[in-house]
Amino acid sequence: MAKRVSLPDVVISAPKAVFKPAKEEALACILPKYYKSMADMSIKTNSVIDKCWFCNQDLVFRPISIETFKGGEVGYFCSKICRDSLASMVKSHVALREEPKISLLPLVFYEDKEKVINTINLLRDKDGVYGSCYFKENSQIIDISLRSLL
């Protein structure tokens, strides 16, 4: 059996097994000497708060944002469809808290943008909607399939 030892003068406030040191932000880009940096800049994010970042509709009520991995928020959206569609596009650049459930192409792809916007407005308050779109190259048609289990 192991002998129990009491150490009254020792205080363990953060044991190594539990304590994880806070990491600084990762270095963005380290180039070998034989590469030459052609562009290196930092730009603030868009500050427009009265228009949806995906469909450009006026925000007449409380906007929805994309939640980031570290608990922050980015963007202003009129619906979950718009939020998830943009999140699908930027997920390789922005660390997201959760995987987007809906993925639509940007509105510039569609000939009848109003039809897509009407669908967004119709499903704005619905929960549990998921789906995506598929581009048919031969016929130049985009099939949108949004579903719900509820």
Curated annotation (Swiss-Prot):
Pfam families: Pox_TAA1, zf-FCS. The keyword Secreted does not apply. One of its GO terms (molecular function) is zinc ion binding. Keywords: Activator, Transcription, Transcription regulation. The keyword Chaperone does not apply. Belongs to the orthopoxvirus VLTF-2/OPG126 family. Acts with RNA polymerase to initiate transcription from late gene promoters. Interacts with itself. Interacts with the late transcription factors VLTF-1/OPG093. This is Viral late gene transcription factor 2. It comes from Variola virus (isolate Human/India/Ind3/1967) (VARV). The lineage of its organism: Viruses, Varidnaviria, Bamfordvirae, Nucleocytoviricota, Pokkesviricetes. The gene is OPG126.
